[in-house]
């Protein structure tokens, strides 16, 4: 219903903070529940069983809050984390740009120093919660070097020079609004920088490892719901006086769906454990797990 009516369930999302879901892997010292990536994947998968779009939206908020906690200084953490943990404010992650996708080394949004502010110019694309959320953890270019010139800033929705495009028209996930984020001489305090200048590329890469796991988990949850609905339907629908669940061809299809789902789940859980343990091959496994989970999920849903 939320998807069909394009309803953004902000109250429901905020209520999830009572379960700690506003700060799943934010440290306990910062008010989070400090779970690992495997536990987070289990939570995202379970929520996606009910609504993949809402689960994915909450996962993005968690990525943004985690970046501030993991890499921000004491001042920026004290200023933003309490409201993010309680979800009084909801956060987005702004990396993707027109023409460069999520290639952090190729982004073109610039930030130049002007006194105690950065002045931002550029456009971010496909930003979840764009125009609805309060806080945007944003990757910008402060230097010429491809990867060493990327810096991370916390941008607030109402800062001067920040605007948003119209909501994107999508085939699904319409309970999660998506829009461009536009900077026209936007002024952001230097105090809103997360970590040191030029360190943003490393933060972005670490964030994408967790993001891939969460999107894969959302796909698993949605696919499991579709499989369960399909099994129930085959037991109810009859042909020639027999439930179609008794037909061997139907059983073959359901078995293939279940097998692909369990294979994707096993790889995703393995990748999540590797990210939690900071294994040297964590990025490879998180990318593989996301690819398999989303492709298998689409197949099962179709």
Predicted regions and their residues:
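Short glycine/proline-enriched turns and hinge-like loops at secondary-structure junctions
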Residues: 35-36, 103-105, 129-133, 147-149, ...
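Long, acidic (Asp/Glu-rich), low-complexity accessory segments flanking structured domains
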Residues: 184-202
């Amino acid at each position: 219903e939320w998807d069909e009516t394009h309803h953004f369930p902000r109250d429901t999302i905020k209520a999830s903070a009572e379960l700690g879901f506003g700060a799943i892997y934010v440290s306990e010292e910062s008010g989070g529940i400090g779970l690992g990536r495997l536990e987070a994947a289990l939570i995202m998968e379970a929520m996606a069983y009910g609504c993949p779009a809402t689960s994915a939206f909450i996962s993005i908020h968690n990525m943004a809050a985690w970046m501030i906690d993991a890499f921000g200084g004491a001042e920026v953490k004290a200023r933003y984390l309490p409201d993010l943990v309680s979800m009084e404010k909801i956060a987005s992650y702004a990396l993707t740009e027109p023409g460069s996708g999520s290639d952090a080394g190729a982004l073109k949004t610039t930030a130049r120093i002007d006194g105690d502010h950065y002045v931002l110019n550029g456009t971010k694309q496909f930003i979840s919660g764009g125009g609805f959320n309060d806080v945007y953890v944003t990757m910008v270019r402060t230097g010429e070097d491809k990867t060493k010139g990327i810096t991370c800033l916390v941008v607030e929705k109402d800062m001067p020079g920040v605007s948003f495009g119209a909501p994107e028209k999508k085939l699904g996930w319409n309970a999660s609004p998506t829009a461009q984020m536009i900077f026209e001489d936007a002024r952001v305090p230097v105090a809103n920088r997360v970590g040191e200048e030029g360190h943003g590329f490393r933060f972005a890469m670490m964030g994408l490892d967790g993001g891939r796991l969460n999107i894969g988990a959302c796909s698993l949850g949605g696919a499991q719901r579709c499989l369960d609905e399909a099994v129930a339907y085959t037991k109810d629908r009859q042909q020639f006086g027999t439930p179609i669940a008794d037909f061997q061809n139907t059983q073959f299809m359901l078995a293939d769906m279940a097998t692909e789902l369990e294979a994707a789940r096993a790889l995703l859980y393995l990748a999540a454990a590797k990210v939690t343990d900071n294994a040297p091959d964590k990025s490879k496994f998180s990318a593989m797990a996301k690819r398999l989970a989303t492709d298998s999920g689409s197949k099962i849903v179709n």
